[in-house]
């Protein structure tokens, strides 16, 4: 009888039973409703770029740091318009005039959907969280919800995030 109890306890131990609460979309959305900064590498089609990102309650700012010929190009996205800057020039445009699969707009869509718990599901995978929306899947840190990566298969676009920092924490 002792062996059976020991084997059962050992199986429970190996199966990872814990009392840790599961992360919810509401908790993740709360984090993404705040301000944050990040660095990311994006691959879209046959191209790639490195960017810096800053999100606040008013806008999302994205600046290209690589490739060298686009370094310094930036876009600040507001609700329905954007301000594009490059080499001392600025132009305001409506966001709906940008091509649908533009990495800038995909990031805006990602952050917008991760800010609304009704727009994505959340599950655990390999010690991280997997958020799935209509057009994307994203891997989040289980510790603080920071983005690790995101994929938009329909647009052949991927983002790998580094230095992702929420201003107010989790």
Residue ranges and their predicted role:
Residues 1-16:
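Sec-dependent bacterial lipoprotein signal peptides
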Residues 13-58, 69, 96, 167-170:
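N-terminal leader/targeting segments and the immediate start of mature chains
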Residues 27-32, 37-42, 84-136:
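Flexible, processing/modification-adjacent segments and terminal tails
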Residues 49-54, 75, 137-140, 163:
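Hydrophobic/aromatic beta-strand elements that line small-molecule binding cavities or substrate pockets
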Residues 52-109, 154-158:
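An acidic-aromatic
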Residues 61-66, 115-170:
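Gly/Pro-enriched, hydrophobic low-complexity segments
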